[in-house]
Amino acid sequence: MFSRDLTIAKYDAELFEAMQQEALRQEEHIELIASENYTSPAVMEAQGSVLTNKYAEGYPGKRYYGGCEYVDVVEQLAIDRAKELFGADYANVQPHAGSQANAAVYLALLSAGDTILGMSLAHGGHLTHGASVSSSGKLYNAIQYGIDGNGLIDYDEVERLAVEHKPKMIVAGFSAYSQVLDFARFRAIADKVGAYLFVDMAHVAGLVAAGVYPNPVPFADVVTTTTHKTLRGPRGGLILARANADIEKKLNSAVFPGAQGGPLEHVIAAKAICFKEALQPEFKAYQQQVVKNAQAMASVFIERGFDVVSGGTQNHLFLLSLIKQEISGKDADAALGKAFITVNKNSVPNDPRSPFVTSGLRFGTPAVTTRGFKEAECKELAGWICDILADLNNEAVIDAVREKVKAICKKLPVYGN
């Protein structure tokens, strides 16, 4: 029998110390990685609940194990809330991650060797959209589209490639593109060549839920997302679709038993909480602020003479090219890290450096907005970053910025009392 008094602190001091240090890092450092955010205590409570004990292969009302009557309630709540949130007729809340949701979509609708048309990783796409190092690029014939000289998707080029290669599926989505996707145009191109349209909205799902970014569900045959990032929930995946009995059946079979075994019901419970939070009026205000903050930061970099890819942002992220400054993303990342500002190095279009070094940085504002930053704080923060980028080896500037970061983080904590 387990005692409820047996805590990690009492049982595993070494592990607890690492966890405490990570908690301190999150409070004292400014988080600008576009794919990161802070979950609510309720989301974390669900992930640490007794639901982690329950195996539940199958779907609500149709399980391969007994004793699933209560996890059925949990999972159905998540399904119903996801459908309401995104205006979908179908939702599968079982994918363990966004990449696994994407893999399930391919498994459901494609055969090995089929042609897919997705955005190049080097131009802002995602590994799972056909990159050669990913299973999506190994199992399928992946054709890639990119951005033009203005940093925008060239839809005429997408259409030309679609007509030339006749893909079975067109993938719309990104990991580093700061503008709004034209889902209607993607739909028209897909219809022209008889392709499925698959939208991966992992980065902008929270914006979509709040109505501050176009909803792809009415246009796509299938939509996937992660449940963290802008959606601010647990790390996990989600598949959505309009009513189509054939596609729904294929998607369910592809997730289980095709790609996964038992679902993680404790994570699904956390997803249910996340969806409920996203249905509240204050979530829309939060997402509106996320975009305002990203635009405020981008404007400062442009004013200071830096190149923002595509000239600005209409969502939660933007890419900063450092080619003109002859600075590597790796070195810039390290210097900012010393000032307690967490970013990620990122390849930029026509990047002369390797993906392990890069010539750019990716910035995102979901996490800083969660802790209360508004435009004024974000502009000030962007100015501090510019000061460091002006001379990566100026330790005095780095030290001064670090003290400012610690002060503003203390003023605007992630988790209050």
From Swiss-Prot:
Q: What does this protein do?
A: Catalyzes the reversible interconversion of serine and glycine with tetrahydrofolate (THF) serving as the one-carbon carrier. This reaction serves as the major source of one-carbon groups required for the biosynthesis of purines, thymidylate, methionine, and other important biomolecules. Also exhibits THF-independent aldolase activity toward beta-hydroxyamino acids, producing glycine and aldehydes, via a retro-aldol mechanism.
Lineage, highest ranks first: Bacteria, Pseudomonadati, Pseudomonadota, Gammaproteobacteria, Pseudomonadales
- Protein name (Swiss-Prot/TrEMBL): Serine hydroxymethyltransferase 2
Share what the entry says about its subunit structure, partners included.
Homodimer.
Kindly list the GO CC terms recorded for this protein.
Answer: cytosol
Gene3D superfamilies from the UniProt entry? Aspartate Aminotransferase, domain 1, Type I PLP-dependent aspartate aminotransferase-like (Major domain)
Q: Which gene encodes it?
A: glyA2
Q: Which UniProt keywords apply?
A: Amino-acid biosynthesis, Cytoplasm, One-carbon metabolism, Pyridoxal phosphate, Transferase
Pathway connected to this protein = One-carbon metabolism; tetrahydrofolate interconversion; Amino-acid biosynthesis; glycine biosynthesis; glycine from L-serine: step 1/1
The entry sums up its family as follows: Belongs to the SHMT family.
Q: What class of enzyme is it?
A: transferase
The scientific name of the source species is Pseudomonas putida (strain ATCC 47054 / DSM 6125 / CFBP 8728 / NCIMB 11950 / KT2440)
- Enumerate the residues binding (6S)-5,6,7,8-tetrahydrofolate: L121, G125, H126, L127, S354, P355, F356
Q: Note whether Signal occurs among the keywords.
A: no
